[in-house]
């Protein structure tokens, strides 16, 4: 049986990455093989591209193309082989992030991102996407108190507002796979909701 593909999305500072370990533990507790990965990255080449994408200045279309180049490698080398052998894949970001960050945040025409999506993975979509949502002001405040920011995390509040709107538009357009999670609550409360969703989500 083919595995399931679960993605976690949300703008920087929304808290999504904090819950990956708990999700993996729940799935492994069912006796499933779980592959935990991330974008950009997930492969040796993808991690090199990640460094460029997070820290180097570049044209917005170059950024978009590099994101999808890393994604193509990630799908071919990690995601598809894992799903084919029956493993469940849990990824910190996938293509929804390109619609939010490159289309929404950077202003790349959405039809270009749609064309890349159709070319790079025409038959692959997440089975479940957990979208962690917080007000822009909370995101910015969390980032200011955290580690040294990358180039995305140094962007303006308006940039993050466009990202948030991009994510919410994706969730509204594809409600069958999205679960919207209020990340502006205590960590334990958010984790309980995440784990409840995962326990209800079956193959």
From Swiss-Prot:
HAMAP family in the cross-refs: Thymidylate_kinase
Protein name from the UniProt record: Thymidylate kinase
Keyword Heme: no
Matches recorded under SUPFAM superfamilies: P-loop containing nucleoside triphosphate hydrolases
Substrates-to-products reaction catalysed: dTMP + ATP = dTDP + ADP
Record key words, sorted: ATP-binding, Kinase, Nucleotide biosynthesis, Nucleotide-binding, Transferase
InterPro entries tied to this protein: P-loop_NTPase, Thymidylate_kin-like_dom, Thymidylate_kinase
Pfam families referenced in this protein's UniProt entry, alphabetically: Thymidylate_kin
Native species: Methylobacillus flagellatus (strain ATCC 51484 / DSM 6875 / VKM B-1610 / KT)
Gene3D superfamilies in UniProt: P-loop containing nucleotide triphosphate hydrolases
Gene responsible for this protein: tmk
